[in-house]
Amino acid sequence: MQQNTNVDPQEIAKFERMAETWWDLNGEFKPLHLLNPLRLNYIDQTAGGIFGKKVLDVGCGGGILSESMARIGAIVHGLDMGEEPLEVARLHALETGVSINYVKNTAEAHREDHREYYDVVTCMEMLEHVPDPLSVIQACCDMVKPGGFVFFSTINRNIKSFVETIIGAEYLLKMLPIGTHDHNKFIKPSELMALVDNTDLLCKDALGITYNPLTGIFKYTPKVDVNYMIATQKVD
C-alpha cells in the first residue's frame, strides 16, 4: 500500500473522538503521559542525543512525544492523519511556546519529498493501527539518513497482552476507552523484526515496558511480552 491508502478510517475516527482530552493528564491519554518519559529517554540515549537533530514523529497524534523531543532541542516534524488531534497538537504547541511543524499526511506520501532527510524517525504505538505495517516501516526507513535511527513501539500478541491491555487497561482499570485496541492487530517482536528485515534497517535493541497498577508507574523491563520498543539503525 502506498500514499494515502494505508489508513484505517475507523482508527482515525477513534482518535478524532478523543482528541480534546489529549493533554488532560488524568484523562484518556494518561497512560501515554506516564509512559512518555521512558520513551523520550530511550530515544535520546540510544540515538546519542537528539539535540539539534531533525526528528520525524510518525503517528504523532496530539503531540505528547513530539513536544517532549522539541523541548530538549530536537527539530521536530509531527505527522498524523487525524485533523482533530493535529489541531490539538498545534494549539498546545502555541500555548507552550514549542516550535513543531505538524503535517497531515501518511508516512508513505511524506516520504516523496523527504528521502534520507531525518536523523531520527519515531513511530510509537502506531503500527497496530494501520492495515499494512510494512509499508509504514519501509517509508520510515526511506526517510531516515544512512546511520540514522528509527524507533518503533507496539504491543505483543499473546494471552498476557490481551489480559493486561484490553481486559485490564480498558475494562477493569478504565485507563483507556473500550475498543482502543484490537488484539488481532498486535504484533509479536519476531514479526516486527521480520518486517524490519525487509528494509535497510538493522535492529539494534529491544526493550519492554511494564506497568504496575498499584503504584501507577511504568518502568523498563527486559521482557517484551506486552509493551515493547525496538531501536533500529539504517545501514550506511
From Swiss-Prot:
What superkingdom heads the lineage?
A: Bacteria
Q: Which GO terms describe its biological process?
A: methylation
| Matching Gene3D superfamilies | Vaccinia Virus protein VP39 (3.40.50.150)
State one molecular function term (GO). Answer: 3-demethylubiquinol 3-O-methyltransferase activity
Enzyme class, first EC level, given as a word: transferase
Assigned EC number: 2.1.1.222, 2.1.1.64
Biological pathway: Cofactor biosynthesis; ubiquinone biosynthesis
Keywords, alphabetical: Methyltransferase, S-adenosyl-L-methionine, Transferase, Ubiquinone biosynthesis
Q: What InterPro entries does the entry give?
A: SAM-dependent_MTases_sf, UbiG_MeTrfase
Give the reactions, separated by semicolons, that this protein catalyses: a 3-demethylubiquinol + S-adenosyl-L-methionine = a ubiquinol + S-adenosyl-L-homocysteine + H(+); a 3-(all-trans-polyprenyl)benzene-1,2-diol + S-adenosyl-L-methionine = a 2-methoxy-6-(all-trans-polyprenyl)phenol + S-adenosyl-L-homocysteine + H(+)
| Residues bound to S-adenosyl-L-methionine | R39, G59, D80, M124
Q: Which SUPFAM superfamilies match?
A: S-adenosyl-L-methionine-dependent methyltransferases (SSF53335)
Family, similarity comment: Belongs to the methyltransferase superfamily. UbiG/COQ3 family.
Record function comment: O-methyltransferase that catalyzes the 2 O-methylation steps in the ubiquinone biosynthetic pathway.
Write down what this protein is called: Ubiquinone biosynthesis O-methyltransferase
